[in-house]
């Protein structure tokens, strides 16, 4: 029996862990223990721990990491510190054989650091990708702590190897969030439940930590651009709690646009595939929209450098540029997107490797390969 520790902080990581957890549940020789923290436990971000419960996923531990809810880089640093402080005792109690961490999210960064210090093998999902914000540094730092790497494409694999990781410990498995998307049941009632008319845009714009002071002006430009498309409805999903989020939330709430604090995976998928495009700077616009051939209007630097499909139309934070990108996206509708992040079989591959790979003390001590 291999025991696996997993932590989730927000929808962005939970949506990718969910299909893996479902796959783990099919195996009698595997057992997971889930730690829930961060946005999941915050009312202002939708208290999405309830979505996890609705999915009938077993929750073993919870703790709050955003104690002060401080909208700054200092607040993010404090939250990371809290998670690093809380996790050793949880892991001592869990006694996992391995940790499955992912992406570039703070709670996952924390468990990766703690696991490495406690000599617990760390399996990291989606290392090797290039992004904007502090996420760029976090992701690559996690890769250096991790022992095995489940990359989303060959481009990311090669970058991990160039970072000095052992090539035999790097695997191209695709993006597991696509597995989750394809498993969602179609729900034709979703538009009525959110009072939406077609055509409409989904909008998800997060703050950029390295551009902390500009989040207000950035969302203003996006709102101005969307207002030019009078025949299109819209639904804003409020941002994560990275530094600068309060300004975005205030401006969205002050506008006449519809908004929600958060969406569960099922509603998000059913809205996304019925939309005319995803506007903003979410990684979902890079990883997930190609699955349903939905165009993405990607604004700013947050996803800078990431491998993207032909459905992505980039723009700076400028009203006129955003308008042109939206027009291009509308013209693109009906086309087929390249599937550069896999086709929905990532979870089974990841679980196969979890069962088979060496987790003995032989792999704990890492050394750069050059």
Q: Where are the model-predicted features located?
A:
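Nucleotide-activated sugar donor-binding and catalytic core shared by glycosyltransferases
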Residues: 1-370
């Amino acid at each position: 029996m291999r025991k696996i520790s997993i932590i989730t902080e927000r929808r962005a990581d939970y949506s990718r862990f969910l299909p893996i957890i479902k796959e783990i549940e099919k195996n009698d020789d595997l057992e997971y223990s889930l730690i829930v923290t961060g946005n999941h436990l915050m009312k202002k971000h939708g208290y999405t721990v309830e979505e996890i419960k609705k999915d009938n996923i077993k929750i073993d531990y919870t703790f709050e990491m955003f104690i002060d809810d401080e909208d700054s880089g200092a607040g993010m640093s404090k939250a990371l510190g809290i998670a690093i402080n809380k996790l050793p005792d949880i892991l001592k109690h869990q006694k996992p054989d391995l940790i499955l961490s992912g992406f570039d999210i703070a709670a996952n960064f924390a468990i990766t650091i703690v696991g490495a210090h406690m000599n617990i093998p760390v399996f990291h999902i989606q290392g090797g990708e290039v992004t904007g914000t502090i996420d760029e540094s976090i992701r690559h730092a996690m890769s250096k702590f991790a022992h095995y790497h489940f990359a989303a494409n060959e481009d990311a694999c090669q970058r991990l190897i160039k970072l000095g990781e052992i090539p035999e410990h790097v695997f191209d498995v695709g993006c597991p969030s696509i597995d989750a998307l394809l498993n969602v049941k179609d729900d034709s009632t979703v538009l009525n439940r959110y009072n939406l008319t077609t055509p409409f845009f989904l909008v998800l714009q997060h703050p950029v930590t390295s551009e902390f002071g500009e989040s207000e002006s950035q969302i203003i430009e996006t709102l101005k651009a969307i207002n030019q498309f009078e025949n299109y409805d819209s639904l804003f999903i409020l941002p994560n709690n990275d530094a600068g989020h309060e300004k975005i939330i205030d401006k969205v709430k002050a506008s006449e646009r519809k908004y929600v604090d958060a969406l569960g995976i099922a509603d998000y998928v059913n809205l996304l595939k019925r939309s005319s495009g995803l506007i903003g700077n979410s990684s979902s616009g890079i990883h997930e929209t190609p699955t349903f051939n939905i165009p993405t209007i990607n604004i700013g630097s947050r996803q800078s450098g990431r491998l993207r499909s032909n459905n992505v139309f980039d723009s700076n934070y400028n009203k006129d540029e955003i308008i042109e990108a939206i027009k291009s996206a509308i013209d693109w509708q009906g086309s087929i997107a390249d599937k550069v992040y896999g086709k929905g079989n990532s979870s089974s591959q990841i679980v196969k490797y979890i069962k088979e790979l060496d987790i003995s003390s032989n792999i704990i001590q890492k050394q750069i390969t050059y």
